[in-house]
């Protein structure tokens, strides 16, 4: 019984370490600047979504995007998504509510479980900058969002604009390849 208890304790410690790492990444990447609470996990509205329609609404052309509730509330936040759906949102920019819980192995629509008609997260969500983070880092963020936050019931108005509008903007030609090309390139120092 002691061996089981010890293994269980190690598993709990590993999960807690992953959550703490995810918290550090969320704070250091300033998720709270848009999603609520600035960079302070002790703030009253930490990551529970846009509350001020003037300062946290992002006008982009004729559309407006609004930062969502990231807490694990089932009705108004991320509670109905799996950690893999959150991972896919961070890696591929896919809206978790419109993407199945599957491992994606390609960024080409219709291949490797990538949706044929993808619906992307709206700008200014910086998923394009995050896509080259390690799997471990992205899953740590997902773990923090799912298991490290208390659920808060706070409905944020949906962003305006057709869901397929962003698909024409998120192309390899505009944002570069994933994964990033190997180091060094012709523009970098280093031994080849």
Where are these regions (language model features)?
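Conserved hydrophobic/aromatic "anchor" residues
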Residues: 26, 86-89, 144
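Short pre-active-site segment immediately N-terminal to redox-active cysteine/selenocysteine motifs
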Residues: 27-30, 38, 74
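Electrostatic cytochrome c docking/interface patches
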Residues: 7-27, 41, 80
């Amino acid at each position: 019984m002691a061996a089981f208890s010890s293994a269980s304790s190690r598993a709990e410690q590993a999960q807690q370490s992953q959550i703490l790492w995810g918290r550090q990444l969320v704070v250091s990447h300033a998720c709270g600047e848009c999603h609520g609470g600035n960079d302070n996990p002790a703030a009253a509205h930490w990551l529970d979504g846009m509350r001020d329609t003037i300062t946290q609404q992002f006008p982009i052309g004729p559309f407006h995007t609004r930062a969502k509730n990231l807490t694990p509330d089932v009705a108004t936040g991320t509670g109905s998504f799996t950690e893999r759906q959150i991972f896919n949102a961070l890696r591929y920019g896919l809206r978790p509510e419109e993407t199945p819980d599957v491992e994606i192995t390609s960024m080409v629509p219709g291949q490797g479980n990538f949706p044929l008609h993808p619906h992307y997260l709206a700008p200014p969500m910086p998923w394009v900058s995050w896509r080259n983070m390690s799997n471990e880092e992205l899953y740590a963020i997902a773990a923090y969002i799912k298991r490290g936050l208390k659920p808060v019931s706070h409905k944020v108005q949906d962003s305006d604009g057709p869901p397929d509008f962003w698909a024409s903007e998120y192309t390899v030609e505009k944002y570069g390849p994933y994964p990033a090309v190997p180091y060094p390139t012709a523009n970098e120092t280093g031994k080849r």
